């Protein structure tokens, strides 16, 4: 389907606990509020892109429990194609507990549940869908074998571009194999430094602070190392984003145009990625413009509580 985005990965049922400060080990504290929301990186990214008007298909697996039933209804309400959302019996849906402090920072504990049962056959069932998409978007929350398989299938097609959100990062060799099939890599600063250190056996950078030029040089070296990368995008929170491309004339630091009052940063990275995919694929904007537009969407999300509940629709973007 023309300008179609397919997302492979995890769906979660999120429980948010709000606190004034994070508890220390062994400490019991009183929370200030509790909310539930839909989550999971793949689900979040698909929902945000769909809210902005993209045609999105999600490949994920749910449990046959109340949270799974509600999650499936949520996808349908958000106009996501659920043809490849499968349901498994006697296994709980994925879930996450998210602790958010008064500054909007968070700690997260994830239980994979049904997400851990997403398999290569599920991806094979969606082969035609993937290969006829304009973009395949993946993360690392489900089996790495499944993610690798999806990326390989996508690159068998000349049409489908691939985007990998390298989180949660680890040092599994399968990730290096994935890089052979990735066009656009998206990382945050910590993930970039971790990837750079493991790639170049550099153990001296873990505690250092890096300036923008040093981070861009890391990206440039990674693009030279992994020749399939066309672009690396680095999210820097309140400091904006970096774009580093094979075409060096596109390299830039995109700073935030306005500061906002942060309430909750949960899911903001997914909001940015889903929005970026939308603007790049559906609206066919250039890379830099897509990043700027996505940054604006994500900056709205951090002014609201929750993950998907914080995501703006297209008519809320000025």
Swiss-Prot record:
Domain of life of the source: Eukaryota
InterPro entries: PfkB_dom, Ribo/fructo_kinase, Ribokinase, Ribokinase-like
Pathway: Carbohydrate metabolism; D-ribose degradation; D-ribose 5-phosphate from beta-D-ribopyranose: step 2/2
Entry binding sites for K(+): 264, 266, 301, 304, 306, 310
Ranges in a coiled coil: none
MF terms (GO), sorted A to Z: ATP binding; metal ion binding; ribokinase activity
Keyword presence, Transferase: yes
Residues reported to bind ATP: 188, 235-240, 269-270
SUPFAM superfamilies: Ribokinase-like
Gene3D superfamilies from the UniProt entry: 3.40.1190.20
Cofactor: how and how many bound: Requires a divalent cation, most likely magnesium in vivo, as an electrophilic catalyst to aid phosphoryl group transfer. It is the chelate of the metal and the nucleotide that is the actual substrate.
Catalytic activity as recorded in UniProt: D-ribose + ATP = D-ribose 5-phosphate + ADP + H(+)
UniProt-listed GO biological process terms: D-ribose catabolic process
Principal location: cytoplasm
Entry's EC annotation: 2.7.1.15
Cofactor(s) needed for function: Mg(2+)
GO CC field: cytoplasm; nucleus
Assigned keywords, A-Z: ATP-binding, Carbohydrate metabolism, Cytoplasm, Kinase, Magnesium, Metal-binding, Nucleotide-binding, Nucleus, Potassium, Transferase
Catalytic site: 270 (proton acceptor)
Cysteines engaged in disulfide bonds, as pairs: none
Activity control note: Activated by a monovalent cation that binds near, but not in, the active site. The most likely occupant of the site in vivo is potassium. Ion binding induces a conformational change that may alter substrate affinity.
Subcellular location: Cytoplasm; Nucleus
Function (record text): Catalyzes the phosphorylation of ribose at O-5 in a reaction requiring ATP and magnesium. The resulting D-ribose-5-phosphate can then be used either for sythesis of nucleotides, histidine, and tryptophan, or as a component of the pentose phosphate pathway.
Family indicated by similarity: Belongs to the carbohydrate kinase PfkB family. Ribokinase subfamily.
Protein name, entry field: Ribokinase
Gene: rbsk
